[in-house]
Amino acid sequence: MKLSFHGQSTIYFEANGKKVIVDPFITGNELSDLNAEDVEVDYIVLTHGHGDHFGDTVEIAKKNNATVVGLAEVADYLSTSQGVENVHPMNIGGKWEFEFGSVKYVQAFHSSSLTNEDGIPVYLGASTGLILEVDGKTIYHCGDTGLFSDMKLIADRHPVDICFVPIGDNFTMGIEDASYAINEFIQPKISVPIHYDTFPYIEQNPEDFKKLVNKGEVQILKPGEEVKFD
């Protein structure tokens, strides 16, 4: 499996001959190394509806005839309002086996909406994290979230190999809460900090996060770099 980070909360992986992107915020993201027009994927998986996660979903889905996996409200919005033909609705607690591996939606503490063409926020259900089981690895993408103790329950049920954890503060956990989550609750083999430096509100030094983490390895990735694992 190839697993790479592409700025903000975007990750990309290839498994079982399928290409998957999570939270494809590319256009308007100065830290992204991707061009939305060039992205070729079979699946798009979304944690929630905010623009810095929903991003280029519609364009990429239509261009590739890709299946978009998201909460029921997100899937309904895409199919009824945006003309996306292939959607797979899910909800928190649910798991589904796809061609590339499985997706399970877990809770996150955050909000979820998208501003439409008229400037009106559209409610898009809950915000979530993801448990991805791919090629024998368990990946926990925390999405956008504050600190909560049931992260331990999630990790107890699904021992985590690789965790993508937000550290930006202001909108999500900051460095202290994120490192606490890793050390006390999730305890993954590898932690990758995400959701920082994209905007002035979330400027952080990931090395400060790395210094506080004492469980597992921390890999600080530049956009386009791959996670290194056995």
UniProtKB/Swiss-Prot annotation:
Keywords: Hydrolase. GO terms for molecular function: hydrolase activity. The keyword Hydrolase applies. It comes from the Bacteria. Pfam families: Lactamase_B_2. The keyword Membrane does not apply. HAMAP family: UPF0173. Belongs to the UPF0173 family. This is UPF0173 metal-dependent hydrolase Sca_1312. It comes from Staphylococcus carnosus (strain TM300).
